[in-house]
């Protein structure tokens, strides 16, 4: 129960702080920016797909099959593949925003921030999950609090100093990336590249296929819904903001059960 509470705290924190951030950015910079949450909402399921295979699956592969190289192998392979996928999305950011029926000129800069933040959060989650499976829950929660507060403080403080969106994004993303990189290096183990990807898929197959389904549902569903304009987008955003934290907290039950 104690571990469940710690994990639920971590997952709800990961969801709650970005929600507050988008609210404040909407007040400080541009009221439309809160809709970035909905614009990039489908992409979080790419995050969960990678996490399912290369973090959860890899950690279970280590525990069940005695493959001590699985966790670090999953981190490295997952990082390489996720860099390629998120890089492709960023390279085609204009097409993505257009597909979602939103204004490129309004949303592009902070859409880039949102995608980069999601990518860095994925890399961070690889290490966080590793610590949970090693039962270093207190340390994992400490890192989680620092990561989220760092993201929040940098983003909001910079937006209060300047309204230049590019400067805000750079000033937030670079320190966040450096912090995550330091944690990965600090908590990495020596390993040989060895991972049974098919077993990793099998061990967390239910969550994996759920996330693939949700990716397709939200990608095409929100694309159609956002055709109705900014007011409808705002309504969808508020619904997502309310439910997202609850979903992440409930996900702690799955995470805790999987670890056990």
Describe the function of each predicted region:
Residues 7, 34, 129, 137-144, ...:
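Alpha-helical transmembrane segments and their helix-entry boundary regions
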Residues 22, 34-83, 128-133, 233-260:
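Small-residue-rich hydrophobic transmembrane alpha-helices
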Residues 112, 142-157, 161-188:
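Hydrophobic alpha-helical transmembrane segments
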Residues 103, 118-144:
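Cytoplasmic helix-loop-helix junction between adjacent transmembrane helices
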Residues 16-35, 97-101, 157-162, 215-245, ...:
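Helix-terminus/linker motif at the lipid-water interface of multi-pass membrane proteins
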């Amino acid at each position: 129960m104690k571990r469940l509470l710690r994990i639920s705290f971590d997952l709800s924190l990961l969801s709650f702080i970005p929600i507050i951030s988008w609210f404040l950015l909407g007040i400080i910079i541009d009221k439309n920016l809160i809709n970035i949450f909905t614009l990039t909402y489908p992409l979080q399921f790419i995050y969960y797909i990678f996490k399912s295979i290369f973090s959860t699956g890899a950690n279970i592969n280590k525990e069940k099959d005695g493959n001590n190289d699985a966790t670090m192998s999953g981190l490295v392979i997952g990082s390489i593949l996720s860099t390629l996928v998120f890089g492709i999305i960023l390279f085609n950011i204009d097409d993505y925003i257009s597909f979602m029926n939103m204004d490129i000129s309004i949303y592009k800069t902070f859409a880039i921030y949102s995608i980069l933040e999601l990518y860095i959060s994925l890399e961070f989650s690889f290490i966080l999950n590793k610590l949970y499976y090693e039962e270093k829950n207190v340390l994992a929660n400490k890192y989680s609090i620092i990561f989220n507060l760092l993201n929040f403080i940098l983003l909001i403080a910079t937006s209060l100093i300047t309204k230049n969106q590019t400067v805000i994004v750079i000033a937030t993303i670079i320190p966040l990336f450096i912090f995550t990189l330091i944690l990965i290096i600090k908590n990495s183990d020596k390993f040989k590249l060895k991972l049974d990807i098919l077993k990793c898929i099998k061990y967390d197959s239910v969550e994996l296929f759920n996330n693939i389904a949700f990716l397709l549902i939200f990608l095409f569903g929100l694309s159609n819904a956002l055709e109705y304009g900014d007011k409808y987008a705002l309504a969808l955003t508020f619904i997502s903001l309310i439910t997202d934290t609850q979903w992440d907290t409930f996900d702690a039950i799955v995470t805790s059960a999987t670890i056990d």
